[in-house]
A protein has these predicted regions:
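A structural signal for short, hydrophobic/glycine-enriched beta-strand patches
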Residues: 2-36, 41-50, 58-240
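Low-complexity, Gly/Ser/Thr/Pro-rich intrinsically disordered linker/tail segments
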Residues: 238, 242-258
């Protein structure tokens, strides 16, 4: 496919400029009919615009080009649609050391200090850790400020709050939710984790669950400081899932640019 045209299509789609993006993809599909990435993008973004007929059309063409990628796209779309609408369990049944409590990082200030929002995530993780005392905690986040990564700051805070240092596992290189999901999934596999509970800002939960599930994790619920007063998380309409869709294309390895 023509690189300039492909890159232009991607730039439009990630910003939600669908008419421009779809027109560019349609032209690419004609000029480079064997490019499975183009068909995958058409399928993903047709789903993001709730165009079921186009999802079926582009999905069928993708399957003819790459059954493996088609399977991955179909699974990712199913995950997106479920994560966008499911009732999130804030008091999941954990499985001791096989369930990890995962805290997603958030940008530090210039001196390496945590924001109140990140501290709130950590407080919910501590509450979950008290309810599941055998579960390890994974902190994930890079983005260093003054030589301190998000994971460093979170680990230090947890230890100061009385969490045993050997209970905490650190992933200190991720710079996005996509990387949080990919790198934490890999770390969890290394330490024998079978499922996880996510600790993040409520408004970020649906996207985070989608990313982690697409990356291969089994997310069984979310952390909260009070299981009797959980956040109200309305479902996301089909056309409100752009961020989840963009993330899914990255996790599947569909190039952002050619």
């Amino acid at each position: 496919a023509d690189a300039e045209q492909y890159n232009g299509a991607q730039d439009a789609l990630v910003k939600g400029r669908y008419d421009t993006g779809f027109a560019a993809l349609d032209a690419l599909a004609t000029a480079a009919a064997d490019d499975a990435n183009v068909a995958a993008l058409q399928t993903f973004y047709a789903n993001a615009t709730a165009d079921a007929a186009a999802v079926a059309e582009h999905g069928a063409r993708l399957r003819g080009l790459s059954p493996t990628l088609a399977d991955a796209v179909d699974r990712a779309i199913a995950v997106i649609d479920e994560a966008a609408t499911e009732t999130i369990d804030f008091a999941p049944n954990t499985d001791g050391p096989r369930t990890a409590i995962v805290v997603l990082g958030l940008g530090l200030d210039g001196d390496g200090n945590m924001t109140p929002e990140l501290v709130a995530r950590l407080r919910s993780a501590v509450a979950a850790a008290e309810r599941s005392p055998e579960s390890p905690i994974i902190v994930t986040g890079g983005n260093p400020q003054s030589g301190i990564t998000e994971a460093d700051a979170m680990q230090r805070w947890l230890v100061e709050e009385g969490i045993a240092a050997d209970r905490i596992h650190s992933e200190s290189t991720a710079n996005s939710t996509v990387q949080n999901a990919q790198r934490t999934t890999a770390l969890a596999a290394e330490i024998g984790i079978e499922n996880m509970v996510l600790a993040t800002t409520p408004s970020h939960l649906r996207r985070a669950i989608s990313d982690f599930e697409i990356a291969g994790s089994d997310v069984i619920g979310a952390a909260t400081t009070n299981v009797d007063d959980v956040p109200d998380l309305p479902a996301l309409a089909p056309t409100a899932r752009l961020g989840m869709t963009v993330d899914a294309t990255k996790i599947l390895g569909i190039p952002r640019t050619y």
